[in-house]
């Protein structure tokens, strides 16, 4: 099916949605910004209520380019990187630690900057040459890992962890197709 890809992340407790975020998606989406889709929000609320589920839920959707319909194409009962949309929201922890005390649905702040992975954006710039788009993304967003007060995770991921993984694949002769900085792994051919 061809069309627009969308993703959500939700925390539910006994059928009630406690936290919710959504975004435009793509394979290995590495840039996150809340889009506040009313249609998807209603779908997630209805699903959680009807199933009385508790836990973390990640849904992927496709809006068909042929009929305009929204189709739910995947559900993963786990944390998703869409959770990064809450990077500046202090209330998210409450959904995990004290779900019964959550009074209203926790959503990313409307003025929250989108999240990106810097080296992914550099590769995008080098492969597309879209300087204005790159600058807009980098200047208006925040890096998922970099924090000026604690740069070690950023340095460790990009200059130690990923290079060691690449060297391992080169040394063992295992072919790879991409580096996924979001989850800190080298995706091998035939892998996920």
Annotate each PLM feature.
Residues 25-32, 76-89:
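Glycine-rich phosphate/pyrophosphate-binding beta-alpha loops
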Residues 14-16, 25, 33, 50-51, ...:
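Domain-wide signal for the mature, well-folded portions of proteins, strongly enriched
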